[in-house]
Swiss-Prot record:
Disulfide bonds: none annotated. This is Protein RnfH. It comes from the Bacteria. Belongs to the UPF0125 (RnfH) family. Gene3D superfamilies: RnfH-like. InterPro entries: Mopterin_synth/thiamin_S_b, RnfH, RnfH_sf.
Length: 96
């Protein structure tokens, strides 16, 4: 019988953060952790085919295994291009 592990699943919005703790069987995947967290039912803006995922800021795939104490992070898509924002800030600084 597999041992149980505890995992956190996090999803952050500008106005609200979600942090769900789940208990899973050892050998569970990132996808199983997200499903067990219930976040897919709470947030219809999460699309596992589009949202990037990580464990403590390191990119992972849905089929990767989670370990006891991991924090699975569901990332939102970027709103603006980081290069463009840096360029705009540089232009603004140069204009001063």
């Amino acid at each position: 019988m597999p041992a149980n592990i505890r995992v956190e699943v996090a999803y952050a919005l500008p106005e609200k953060q979600y942090l769900q703790r789940v208990t899973l069987d050892e050998g569970a995947t990132v996808e199983q952790a997200i499903i067990a967290s219930g976040l897919l039912a709470l947030r219809d803006d999460i699309d596992l085919a589009k949202n990037k995922l990580g464990i403590y800021s390191r990119p992972v795939k849905l089929h990767d295994e989670v370990h006891d104490g991991d924090r699975v992070e569901i990332y939102r898509p970027l709103i603006a291009d980081p290069k463009e924002l840096r360029r705009q800030r540089a232009e603004k600084s140069a204009a001063k």
